[in-house]
Amino acid sequence: MKSEAKDGEEESLQTAFKKLRVDASGSIISLSVGEGPSVRASARTAADDTKPKTMCASKDSWHGSTRKSSRGAVRTQRRRRSKSPVLHPPKFIHCSTTAPPSSSQLKHRSQTEPPDGISGRGISTPKEFNAGENSTSLDVNHTGAAIEPLRSSVLRLPSESKTEELSDATQVSQESLTANDLSDFQSVSKLSQGKPCVCVGKECQCKRWHDMEVYSFSGLQNVPPLAPERRSLEDYSQSLHTRTLSGSPRSCSEQARVYVDDVTIEDLAGYMEYYLYIPKKMSHMAEMMYT
C-alpha cells in the first residue's frame, strides 16, 4: 500500500511539474490548473524550499545541462581545420613620380602603406605630395634627365638642320613633362608622337631607341643544337637534289621525301618533348580510355 501511494504521489508531482512554469530565480508561477494534486504539489514546494531549487530551477537547466539563453546570438568563430592558407585579396600600393594637377587632389594613402614613404615592396617613394614645390623640383629633375640624351643626339647631326632640331628638342622636353620616365616603351612612344624622327633617311642616331629592349624572348634561347642524324639527312637531301639535276626526273614520292627531310619527324618529336611536355601517366590514361 505504501509503495502504491508513493507511486501515485510521484505521478502527481510529475504532472504538476509539467503544468508549472518555474523561473530561474525559483519563484513559482502556477498556470491555470484546477486539479487537486497540482495545487497540493505547489503548496508542498512552497513549504519545502530546498527541493525546487535542485529539482526544477528552470526548464533550461533540467538534467544538469545548463543551456545558454541566447542560443544563436553570439557564436564564437570555429577554428579552421584545413591546412590551406587563408587567401586575402591583394592590396595595391600606387606610387608615381609625376606631380598631381592640384594640391587638393592628393592621393589617399592605403592603410597598408607604412608611414615613412616606403611602400610594401621596399621601393622608396617620395614622401607625400603635400607641398607643390617638392613635386615640381622632382619633375624638373626628370625633364633635365630627359633632355640630356636628346641634346647629345641633336649635337651629332650636321649643322644645316640644327635650328629645326633644337625646336624639336624643346617640344619634346615639353612633352616629357607628362611622361614618367624614358625607361619604358610607352612613354618614349608618347614622346615621338609630335613629329617624325629627326633622322629619317639617315642612320638613326636616337640613342634611347637602341638601348631599349621592347620584347625579350626567353623560350627560344634554350633550343638544343641539331642532332647528328638531322645533319646527315640534310646532306642526303642535297645529294638527291644534285643527282636529279643531272639525271632523270624524280618520282613524286622522292620529291616529297626530299621536302620532308627539311623538317624531319624526329625534329617534330623533339619539339613535342621540349615545348608540349605531356606526362607519361597522362598519355597512358588517355590510351586506356580510347582503346
Swiss-Prot record:
The keyword Hydrolase does not apply. One of its GO terms (cellular component) is nucleus. Residues 95-105 have a biased composition (Polar residues). It holds the Pfam family DUF776. Keywords: Phosphoprotein. Residues 65-83 have a biased composition (Basic residues). The modification Phosphothreonine is found at residue 143. The keyword rRNA-binding does not apply. Signal peptide: none annotated. Residues 29-139 are annotated as: Disordered. This is Oxidative stress-responsive serine-rich protein 1.
